[in-house]
Structures are given as structure tokens and as C-alpha cells.
Amino acid sequence: MTLHRFKKIALLSALGIAAISMNVQAAERIAFIPKLVGVGFFTSGGNGAQQAGKELSVDVTYDGPTEPSVSGQVQLINNFVNQGYNAIIVSAVSPDGLCPALKRAMQRGVRVLTWDSDTKPECRSYYINQGTPAQLGGMLVDMAARQVNKDKAKVAFFYSSPTVTDQNQWVKEAKAKIAKEHPGWEIVTTQFGYNDATKSLQTAEGILKAYSDLDAIIAPDANALPAAAQAAENLKNDKVAIVGFSTPNVMRPYVERGTVKEFGLWDVVQQGKISVYVADVLLKKGSMKTGDKLDIQGVGQVEVSPNSVQGYDYEADGNGIVLLPERVIFNKENIGKYDF
């Protein structure tokens, strides 16, 4: 081999390696942030997001704080922005606490979306939403009403915190529906477990001890619902109806033992997957508008809705809500079909 030919081959090899390196660096990087790590609901959402990343050949990083806090999420957001991530998808612990960090991210060209729990709409582009407050609040009340078969009843609400966006919107709608459709129901207390399993169990036991004649606990939170079920078992209370939102894998033993007759949720794996697909469209095409539809492998078709479906007044180009296609009520007959 001549020296000239050797140099030519070496140069082409170097160029090829450089091209591969550039392609690797150019791959989209998307951060998918839960309220906190270590909770099955959020882990399942992260699994869906990372599955979508593999299907789309994009790099999806799942990471969150160990406790649900604004400061913890802000630190992660800032870190991902500084590392050059192209998009951030976050389940917000506060409707406004993340806004300064998210607005700075958008100013630097990062696509910002929310999933599960929204910020103020001006602080993100799209919210991947499990259901409108009216849909989910109504679902909670209807599940309770199927078990509380009397005009006068005592009901407790129990969920994560007084500031979290999504759950407070659902509870507001649920309480309004109770006032309208079940005026004899008395809401005796509203309490919080703050996304902590131990505190949630203690709080649930406290509710059942303080209100021994309670008819229903409505717990729209992945920690609060199993805590309420466990508290009822610990206290041997089989009279109270326990409904709410959590994952089927967590709730399966309580359903099989009859402690919980039915509960609801949505396919959070699909929610994570949809979130990444929408982010990928934004990174490739720039924006979506109200009415645009997107076909997603293994999910079906989703559509961009205006912010008004969530009760917001704010509307802007490149801003809206993508609703999940359906929600699910789990019971003893169908829970075996689900694994997340």
C-alpha cells in the first residue's frame, strides 16, 4: 500500500468516525420527569416514554426527585437544559412553581411539555392529559355512588397535597358534582398524604378512626388509594367504600380480597408513550395546532384540543392539550388483563 493511499484511507476513516459522532450527538434527547421516583405509577409512565424513545430512535432519560418538591424538579430541569436536552416533559408538583425555570428553558429553545400534572399553560407548549377535570372528577363520584346506596352519607377526600394541580382540579369537580347530584352527602374531611407511603397510611387510619361511620373514602392518588385500602384492612373496617386512582399492580391484592370493589385510572404507559411522540413531532416539525391528529403505534389516534377543555382561559399558537383516548375502571373481573 502506498503512503498516499494509506493517508487517503485514514482520512476517509476519520471522516466516517466524525460523521458517526455527529449523528450520535445530533440524536434528539428528551427528559421525562415524574413528580418523584420510586412510585409504580410514575415508573410505568417512564417505561412508556422510554419505549417510545426506542421506537422513534430518540434518547429518553427518565429521572425525578426522591421527594415531590419544586426545588427538586427545578434542579433537574436546569440540569437537563444545561446538558443540551432538546425537550423536557414534566409532571409538575406545582402549577406555577416551575414556571420561571420552564420559561428560561423555552427561551433557550427547549421544547417544554407536561404530563399527568400541568403547570399554568403559558409555561409549557402541550399538556398530555389523562382526562379533563370534569371527566375524572365525575368518574370518582360515580364509582362511590355505585357503592353508597343511600341519600345521606359521609364522605372523605384523601389525596397527595393541597397544591398539586391535577388532583385538586379533579376534587373540585367531584365536590361540585356531589353538591349537585348527591346533596345529602356530607364531605366530613379532606386530608393529604404528601406522596409518602408511611404518612399516607397513618393519615388513612386517622380518618377511619376519627369518622367511624364514614361511608366512603375518595382517594385520587397512587399512594393514598392503597393506603386507604390497607388502613381499612388493618382496622378490620369492611363497611367503607374505597375508590380512587392508582395502578392495577398495586391495587390487585385489595381487589382480590374484596377490600376495594372498583377503582379507576388510565393507561399511564400509554401516557408516557404519547408524551414522547408529541415531543418528537415538535422537534421535527416545529409545532402542532388545535385539531391536528397524530397516529401512535400501539395507542391509536390522539388529537390536539384547546386549553379550554381543562378550564383554562389561556390560548396561544403552539399551545394546547392532548387527551388520552380513554380511561379505565378496574374491578375483579378485568384487573387480570392489565400489568402496569
UniProtKB/Swiss-Prot annotation:
It comes from Shigella flexneri. The keyword Signal applies. Gene3D superfamilies: 3.40.50.2300. NCBIfam families: PRK15408.1. Pfam families: Peripla_BP_4 (PF13407). Belongs to the bacterial solute-binding protein 2 family. SUPFAM superfamilies: Periplasmic binding protein-like I (SSF53822). Residues 1-26 form the signal peptide. Keywords: Periplasm, Signal. InterPro entries: Bact_Solute-Bind_Prot2, LsrB, Peripla_BP_I, SBP_2_dom. The complex is composed of two ATP-binding proteins (LsrA), two transmembrane proteins (LsrC and LsrD) and a solute-binding protein (LsrB). One of its GO terms (cellular component) is ATP-binding cassette (ABC) transporter complex. It comes from the Bacteria. GO terms for molecular function: carbohydrate binding. Part of the ABC transporter complex LsrABCD involved in autoinducer 2 (AI-2) import. Binds AI-2 and delivers it to the LsrC and LsrD permeases. It is found in: Periplasm. This is Autoinducer 2-binding protein LsrB.
